[in-house]
Amino acid sequence: MEKNKKLTLTAVLVIVVAVLIDQVIKILVRTQMEQGETISVIGNWFLLHFVENEGIAFGVSFGQKIGKLLLSLFRIGVVGFLTYYVFRRIKEGKLRTGTVVLSSLVLAGAIGNIIDSLFYGVIFGYAPILYGSVVDMFYFPLFLLPDWFPVFGGEYFFPAVFNFADSCVTVGLIGLLFFLKDFADEKKGEK
């Protein structure tokens, strides 16, 4: 039982710390930079570039108001389910520390972006609750692809602008791929 309490505390700490880091960065960018402004952090390959994303990854959106509302509600539902699932599995003693940390990073990233959608429109006066935009700022235009390169020629290798929450989700999901054995072993044990 003691191990379950430690894992629960670990999950809560990872989520709280990651969400706080995400929100501090976003609020600083939102209040100190103009939309579209770029600041060089390291040369021309690590930039802060402030954009607001109304959709999901890479600016993909699902229509106007109804699409934004459905996206926000979907995000909330997924986070609710994942939170229930992770903490239930911790209580059952079914997850290792690495799996808990990585799952918590995914949850923290999702929560960080939900906070933007829920409240930023209201706080900054541009949209009602659930209709806010996600603040993105990290930009790594690593190198320019040659013009002859198929489809993406003349564009930067990594053109996405993203935020800390997106990084948490990505690192968490990639890391969880290495822990899939935990889930497979768990299923074998249940049969």
Regions found by a protein language model. Give the residues of each.
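Alpha-helical transmembrane bundles and membrane-interface segments of multipass inner-membrane proteins
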Residues: M1-K191
